[in-house]
């Protein structure tokens, strides 16, 4: 039915739309806040603003029939201006769930408020234990590693980086480890992002994609070594705002609280960063081997998702345990071994310093940096290893002075000259063949 002046909406005079009045009425009908140009409802961030454009189109299509695309774009921009809000608080005392708000003291309310992240799972304290999920994990991981996974997945429910860890799940392939990512997607919804850890480090726009995200999953980790690790290390331990860039937008400062969960066939390594800080931020769990002749269940994920309310309670249990332990994860002996193996395989200087027949640690001895490096290159040659730089070897020793009971000095006497080296270590002369 054609509209007449008597049926025109208040914001339309027959020729023009009163944008202020339209936006006020639209926001009364669809409450929203605009933070840094992005719209939020009580259900969290609106990822697809096309939904809002469609609602605007429905409102105006009764009175206008041409130029709709441009008008919708202009009205959306006006709505954002009128809905302006400073950044929403990062709340670590509660979890916004599909049916209300769960508080970390164990209380729950059905009330909803504006938030950065609203999970897509409901809080149901009477949900049955997730038997299929627990069976799946028992077939995937060693029993002592399951509490670590439970704590990490619980850690991903809160917008905090106090745990200062990323989790790597390593296997030979085909074990089903990536099912965990799909289950987390069902709990977190749009608060989870799937991308590559390599992209996070190398693409300057990728960090902005992690804003307002609780979890980033890399379900097929690239095995090539990272050329840099600055951003990854900063994000894992993020405690203050960092620079964000979006295409066509002036860079700005924002705080990230995203956690990294990576699945792959090998560990995350760096091309140049062999520091303890890089490895200290990682938890490495290895999966059980895939049983020979096992028939994979194509409906496994569907079965797991039917238990998502119970899985959420299981994750909450891990979160409460983690907080009770002051954000210190339960790390099994096997997981610690995994980390040491990764460190040694990516930094052969560690193996050299623990070897015999090339160097000897003695309190009353000394060796020049050159002599130590020559011993190291002999070790590399004997073990078919590619040698690192002389600076890298000296740096490794200097960073671990207390561990090896050595002391860096520039007062080692060699052939009447004073050179750089270390006290407390000597190079062993090679035996003649």
List PLM regions with ranges.
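Replication-associated primase and helicase/ATPase modules
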Residues: 1-30, 40, 45-46, 125-139, ...
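Intein modules and their embedded homing endonuclease domains
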Residues: 1-119, 388
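Positively charged interface segments
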Residues: 188-190, 195-204, 226-229, 243-251, ...
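Conserved nucleotide-sensing/catalytic segment adjacent to the nucleotide-binding pocket
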Residues: 206-249
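Structural recognition of the conserved hydrophobic beta-strand(s) that form the central parallel beta-sheet
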Residues: 216-218, 258-265
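Phosphate-handling catalytic cores of nucleic-acid transaction enzymes
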Residues: 305-348
